[in-house]
Amino acid sequence: MKPVALVTTKPGFEPQLREELNKLPIKKKILWTPFRGILKVLSQNPYEFLNIIKENKNNLKFSLRIIPLEIGCQTDINEIKKAISFLINKKKEKLKNKSFVVRCNRRGNHEFTSEELERIIGEYVLENFKDLNLRVNLKDWDFKINIEILQDESYISIFQDEFNELVIEENIKNLKNLKRYIERPLNRSERKMQELMEKFPFIFENINCVVDIGSSPGGWAKMLSKKAKKVYAIDTGELKIKANNIIHIKKRAENVDFEKDINEEIDLITNDTNLYPDESLFLTLKFAKHLKTNGYIIHTLKARNLKTKKEDLEKVLKILSYYRNIKIFKIINLRANTKNELTLILKKV
């Protein structure tokens, strides 16, 4: 299977969107993305998937835009040009003497803007496909070169006639007016913890004291408070959640005085902070000396970038090798992790 579509929803309703997409009568796999309100669909081909969407449109309540994907590449201007050339050559008989527009939806941080890329690609197509007698028309075009960028990944399609993105206006209207849930849907951070609880339920059994490092805005603390008698949420930032058993230590983790601020044996340590890998690990290890024997640590390794992920993991593992009573139980790539993240489950022996 390959990426065949991006499907958008109102941010916060990704779990509901995933559930309804999973019910579609087609072989597929639904993936989370690092971007709120966007899921990626893997299947056999985008044309078949789009037809299935149209046939089952009335059963979809959380799908807003369905964007078919024909070809993927790295987010590099030259790679994008190659992918577009491939598609144009494949469809050139249908594109002769037509007008076109280039549209880019860019998500993430890049050295170029969406508008700059649209201009670069437009000029490239005109220069390299003169034999097709193409012309640019920003409003009344015959086909659209559509570029969807998700940080390091880019997806290109040529929309024409019936093959086009599908916008479900009724759902946009309904979701806009939808009353908020009494308890809001899970965000990506909470989905990570939910997945951990489902995969490793024994870690969360009979726990009294949890220390959650870098807790703000409180997603992990909220979920842990339902399993533990007490959660110490360590962060200078505000918590967006409240529970009688959540104790907010409003300090930087490195400034916490354990005897004064906690002073009890820890059953579980969690850390999902946005810090450099080694810096974050040393904070976890600071509290590990107060972790009970056979207690677990859940630590998110956040690499500096995708290219340094292996190097950052090796650095963290080297640091851990000096702590003989802290053993690696599992290194896992959760569905809700970003591409730069790995989840380390450690155990004190």
Swiss-Prot record:
Domain of life of the source: Archaea
Lineage: Archaea, Methanobacteriati, Methanobacteriota, Methanomada group, Methanococci
InterPro entries assigned to the protein according to its UniProt record, in alphabetical order: RNA_MeTrfase_FtsJ_dom (IPR002877), SAM-dependent_MTases_sf (IPR029063), THUMP_dom (IPR004114), tRNA_sulfurtransferase_ThiI (IPR050102)
Pfam family, one: THUMP
GO annotation (BP), single: thiazole biosynthetic process
Sequence ranges assigned to domain THUMP in this UniProt record: 51-160
The protein, known as: Uncharacterized protein MJ1257
Any one annotated GO CC term: cytosol
GO molecular function, one term: methyltransferase activity
